């Protein structure tokens, strides 16, 4: 298990005021999404298909040898997302 993030929170009205929240990822999730390799693990692939090439959350491009940030395109052939208004997704409720 890998620690992905750590968050501290304070609740003023409680006797035990402070809390710590850990965001954890398993080794298999870290490999699948980011491409971090772990030695002596028999089967790292868990979330993506076995024929899948690459790692979806990895920002480093091996061809240009640097981190590449690209805008996310949410359009699909059968659907166009309009993120300006949450009510545009429900035309029957206008």
Swiss-Prot record:
Record's keyword terms, sorted: Electron transport, Membrane, Mitochondrion, Mitochondrion inner membrane, NAD, Oxidoreductase, Respiratory chain, Translocase, Transport, Ubiquinone
Any one cellular-component term (Gene Ontology): mitochondrial inner membrane
First-listed, main subcellular location of the protein, grouped into a coarse class: mitochondrion
Disulphide bonds in the chain: none
Membrane topology: Peripheral membrane protein
Keyword set includes Membrane: yes
Catalytic class of the enzyme: translocase
Presence of the UniProt keyword Translocase in the record: yes
Reaction equations catalysed: a ubiquinone + NADH + 5 H(+)(in) = a ubiquinol + NAD(+) + 4 H(+)(out)
InterPro entries reported in the protein's UniProt record: NADH_quin_OxRdtase_su_C/D-like, NADH_UbQ_OxRdtase_30kDa_su
Sample GO molecular function, one term: NADH dehydrogenase (ubiquinone) activity
Assigned EC number: 7.1.1.2
Pfam assignment, any one: Complex1_30kDa
Subcellular location field: Mitochondrion inner membrane
GO biological process, alphabetically ordered: mitochondrial electron transport, NADH to ubiquinone; mitochondrial respiratory chain complex I assembly
Function: Core subunit of the mitochondrial membrane respiratory chain NADH dehydrogenase (Complex I) which catalyzes electron transfer from NADH through the respiratory chain, using ubiquinone as an electron acceptor. Essential for the catalytic activity and assembly of complex I.
Subunit structure: Core subunit of respiratory chain NADH dehydrogenase (Complex I) which is composed of 45 different subunits. Interacts with NDUFAF3. Interacts with RAB5IF. Found in subcomplexes containing subunits NDUFS2, MT-ND1 and NDUFA13.
Family: Belongs to the complex I 30 kDa subunit family.
PANTHER family, per database record: NADH DEHYDROGENASE [UBIQUINONE] IRON-SULFUR PROTEIN 3, MITOCHONDRIAL, NADH DEHYDROGENASE UBIQUINONE IRON-SULFUR PROTEIN 3
Name of the protein described by the UniProt record: NADH dehydrogenase [ubiquinone] iron-sulfur protein 3, mitochondrial
Record lineage: Eukaryota, Metazoa, Chordata, Craniata, Vertebrata
Gene name for this UniProt entry: NDUFS3
């Amino acid at each position: 298990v890998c620690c992905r993030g750590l968050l501290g929170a304070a609740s003023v009205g409680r006797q035990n005021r402070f809390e710590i929240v850990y965001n954890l990822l398993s080794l298999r999730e870290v490999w699948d999404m980011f491409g971090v390799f772990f030695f002596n693990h028999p089967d790292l692939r868990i979330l993506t298909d076995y024929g899948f090439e690459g790692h979806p959350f990895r920002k480093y491009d091996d061809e240009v040898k640097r981190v590449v940030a690209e805008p996310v395109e949410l359009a699909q052939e059968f659907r166009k997302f309009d993120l300006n208004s949450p009510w545009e997704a429900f035309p029957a409720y206008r």
